[in-house]
Every structure is written in structure tokens, then in C-alpha cells.
Amino acid sequence: GFLWATVLAEHRLRDRLPSEWEGRDVQVVGVVASLPHGFERGERFAFDVEAVETPGARLPRRIMLSWYHGWLEDEWRDGLAIRPAERWRFTVRLKRPHGNANPHGFDYEAWLFERGLRATGYVRPRAVAQRLDDFVARPAYVIERLRDRLRRSFSEALGDAPARPDALTEPLKLAA
């Protein structure tokens, strides 16, 4: 048991963003691996990197991406909706995870580490984002797509009701 835990920990620790690739544009192909979480200016989601198309770049296998709509209407992504289990090509800019280590506070860096998210970043706003595949059939992705379908059903049923899906989708967040 101890040896296996050590091997897994070493494997996870090695899967990190090299410092020389922080803050640089990198083109990646991968799959949206989680239910996107919407916020005021965009969406945030886990992304499984399948291929790095920028020569010489090395990235972790799983990253947390934000995709911003932009401040101005002409910067919005032209109605591109992102869903779990889709394969995309993005140009991203990443950094290593950083979080506060307060004794009684939330440890963001540990939270990311527990989920295998070894870098955070964002989709570059003026670069071309291309959906390559509408559905990648792997068990974890199928579950995320089902969660997405359930969330969309709640949204359609409730419309603009004040209790909108936030309260109803809380079990979906806990299941993740």
C-alpha cells in the first residue's frame, strides 16, 4: 500500500508545468473533462490535454481553463457553447497553481492537486478556437455529458425563475 501510494504521488508530482512555459502561448488539443462552471465573464472547466502542438512545449495532462467572453460585445465568442466530452483545439496561456496556505482557510492549490489539475490558465481571446469532435466516448466523459444534460433540463424547466438551477444543481457539484 505504502509503495503504491509513493509511486502514484511521484507520478502526480512529475506531471507539472515547467516554469519556462508559464505565461507563454501554447496550442493544445484535448477534451473538456468537466461540467463547465459559468461565471460573469465566461466559463471554467477541466481540460484533458491529448496533444501539444507547439514545438518543444511540455504540459500536464490535465489543466483548469477559463474561457472569457470579453468586455466588449465584439470580443464575445460568437455563440460557441462548450460542453463536456467535446474535443477542442485552443491556444492557451498557463501558469502553475498557486494558493494561500492559511491554516483554517481554503487551500486552492491542494484542491487542484487532488483533482489532478497541475496548471491553470485561459483560452487566448483572439486565437482561433476549433471544435474538433462533438463527443468523445470515454466513461468519465459520458458521465459529465449526462450531468450537463441534467443541468440543461433544469435550466429549460425553470427559465428565469429566481431559484434557478444553482440550488438544484448543487448535488451535481458535490458528485464531481
Residue ranges of model-derived segments:
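Membrane-interface helix/helix-cap signal primarily in integral membrane proteins
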Residues: 1-176
